[in-house]
Amino acid sequence: GEIVRIRDESTYRGVPEPRIHTKLNDFPSYGEQMIKFCEEIGFTLMPWQQWLAHHTLKYKPDGRWCHPVVTLLCSRQQGKSTFMALQILFRIYVLEEKLQVHTAHKLTTSAELFYKIYGIIEQNPRLAAEFTKKLESKGFQELQFTKGRRYIVRANNSAGRGIAAPETIHLDEAREYKDEDVWSALRYTQMASANPQIWVYSNAGDQHSIVLNKLRERAMAAIFGGNDDIGWFEWSAPIGIKFDNSPAFWLGVCQANPSLGITVHPD
């Protein structure tokens, strides 16, 4: 977690490894395959995104995910949504998952990602070759692919309705969920999934962020030796950091902003 200075004293690089994370393991990972897939479709993952892909896409000898629940916590404008879009595409095209469901607190947020994914597919002949249909109605969007693969966006108030056995669920803006209704509904849909994984994306929450806070409690217990296979990956500054331009301050900035010096400017 040290600051990497480049070019001159005023230029800093974000720290690729999260300040807080659950225990790492040596199981095999699809991370390299995701990094390679992204390169092939014109995207180079940033160091922190590569680190995240490597440690979250690990699987056990029986093929099941090491972390059935993964939380990515970092500040805004770091590349969370780009990572999510690329991961969704990787799961469609490389892992060939049959169903992924995506919901966010605001439908506009998930709709934005839907169009981002659709745009990437349209611009890439290799991806477009396996794409078959785009469906849209109020509170619902879907992309369909060959071999019965689907990616669905749902408004959060109907996120779990009529959906059976998605392999992966992507829950965005987790800090905004003040109760567990949507979380419970989504988890219920995965009961028949052979190898489910739920991804939770957020920036820092507050005391009302019920879903995020419960996951963080689980993660902290796991970090201190509890028996829980949750994955928690948090890029943040230490609590109580002073805004004083000191080395400690800048280390905190680098820890909270993994894209600093790449896509984010120190200002």
How should each PLM-predicted stretch be described?
Residues 1-267:
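Phosphate/NTP-binding elements of NTP-utilizing enzymes
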